[in-house]
Amino acid sequence: MFKRILIANRGEIALRIIRACRELGIETVAVFIEADRGSAYLEMADAAYCIGPPKAADSYLKIDRVISAAEIGNVQAIHPGYGFLAENAHFAEVCRSCNIEFIGPSHEAMALVGDKNAARRLAREVGVPTVPGSDGLVKDSREAVAVARRIGFPVLVKASAGGGGRGMRVALDEEALVAALKQAEAEADAAFGNGELYLEKYVEHPRHVEVQVLADHAGNAIHLWERDCTMQRRHQKLIEESPAPRLDDSVRRAICDSAVRLIKAAGYTNAGTVEFIVDRQGHYYFIEVNARIQVEHPVTEMVTGIDLIKAQIRVAAGEPLPFRQEDVRTRGAAIECRINAEDATKGFRPSPGTIHRIIPPGGFGVRFDSHVHTGYTVTPYYDSLIGKLIVHQPTRDEAIACVKRALRELRIEGVRTTVPLHVEILDHPAFSEARVDTTFIERTWPS
């Protein structure tokens, strides 16, 4: 087992990893930006090094600075968390060339599944359903129009290296497609340094279902069942739950089996998420692989009782999975609400500032993952996530009642948050009946 791990991230996920390491008897090294200096969660690490100014390009995305901190801190491994360098295959390769274990998949597997076009091709090869679309990358607008005519409008333009909703555009006709190609290419090139695009048939009103997978270096690969992430706005998830409601058991098992088949074919190790969409007829289609821990991993932890961060660390240290597929059972229902410092009444405008008071909720089955505290300053430099409210109860109805109570109990003063919106969503009969799709929030709360 590792003696010391560097956490190449910040905020709630950094604190989550620090806590897991402490329980495993592992020392931690944190890295931080100048604007986060003095944050209370940094005091929980055994060492902390400043790696630069607030801009991510000059700090968390600077591979040389992260590696330098790792060498100064004398660590044996780096946990990337999510975002920043978490899905950067080059970073994973650099870590291992410096004899530092990257807590995640190999750089080869990451490069394979991180290329969405290559991942789709692999999925088709192993019999995992994919959305109809281009056979590969589209070279120009003429080829894109030809593909769209073949599969039919509407179509979805997607960046091969994309993620988080960036580099994606829906086109309803040929004129819109030409414009969407230019916009998606520019956005993807700016965000990922890669403007390559491909086309998919746009599946209208789908649900978003993803599968948590875990694989070790001994060839064992399993799934930890599914999460429903349908409640999202512009491809940004707001509420996640497990198990997915109103999902036929045969579809549930087929999706989970498909996810394992795909990661085995990719030679994937460690934790990852295989994402799918499910149409109104119950047909499911592979979207992409997230080669990292997900923001919403706690809902899976709650229903399975498996600590995913500890599992990641143990797998990276060379340990085999301590359980088989048949050992992984789910119990009850879990729901997570992402609490963002945003004003949902004004187009989800970020609300940076100082938190004057925060009182987290409590009670049976309630978990609040957050790094913030009274006096903490929410900076404008990064995403606005300030906490995750997770509940676990015997049934979905009880989980909904619990999370609604916990949201009303949560007090955050000094910045505007998405708490009022979460309450409205959870009060809506369409949510309680699980009769929603990925456009539900935008249609119901347009802004």
Task: Cite the ranges covered by each PLM segment.
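Acidic/histidine-enriched active-site and ligand-binding environments that engage anionic O-linkages
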Residues: 147-156
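ATP-dependent carboxylate activation and anion-phosphoryl transfer catalytic cores
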Residues: 7-24, 28, 32, 48-50, ...
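ATP-binding N-terminal substructure of ATP-dependent carboxylate-amine bond-forming enzymes
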Residues: 1-125, 138-146, 398
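Alpha-helix initiation/capping motif
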Residues: 59, 84, 112, 137, ...
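Conserved beta3 strand of the protein kinase N-lobe
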Residues: 133-134
